[in-house]
């Protein structure tokens, strides 16, 4: 005879579990760049079956951390939420000195006024030249980390980012 389901299983079925997929997460830490005061954000990539990898990053300008995250031009950190991650785009060396060698576009999956967002190197991170931090993107503070992250995204097909506070 076929096995009968319990009443609770029929009334409150549990949703099917999704298989884990490669995902990026961005969270603010309590650390900051000593010379400029830019808060350090932790960008990690979780690829199922592989060790967790973490990278130091900045988002927004040091003096704009509490600005309206949903307003275009606010220079605030990324708004909290989910984003889709685009292709890894190599850039011509020196063409965009404040973006570095690679651009990875990110697109909010929610309504916000923010546009033209991405993940890139912040070559001015920690320098006192008024360019430390980003206009709202995720800026990795180390070039080797940026190149490693780009390779991990390409290899794993990671296409989602979750920004937490």
Please describe what each predicted stretch is.
Residues 4-132, 144-148, 153-159:
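Cell wall/extracellular polymer interaction/catalysis modules
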């Amino acid at each position: 005879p076929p096995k009968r389901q319990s009443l609770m299983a029929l009334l409150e079925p549990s949703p099917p579990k999704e298989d884990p997929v490669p995902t990026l997460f961005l969270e603010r830490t309590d650390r900051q760049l000593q010379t400029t005061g830019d808060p350090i954000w932790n960008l990690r990539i979780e690829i199922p079956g592989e060790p967790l990898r973490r990278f130091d990053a900045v988002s927004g300008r040091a003096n704009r951390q509490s600005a309206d995250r949903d307003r275009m031009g606010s220079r605030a950190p990324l708004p909290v939420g989910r984003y889709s991650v685009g292709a890894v785009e190599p850039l011509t060396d020196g063409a965009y000195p404040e973006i570095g060698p690679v651009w990875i576009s990110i697109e909010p999956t929610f309504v916000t006024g923010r546009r033209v967002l991405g993940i890139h190197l912040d070559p001015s991170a920690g320098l006192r030249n008024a360019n430390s931090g980003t206009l709202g993107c995720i800026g990795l503070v180390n070039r080797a980390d940026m190149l490693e992250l780009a390779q991990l995204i390409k290899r794993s097909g990671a296409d989602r980012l979750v920004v937490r506070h």
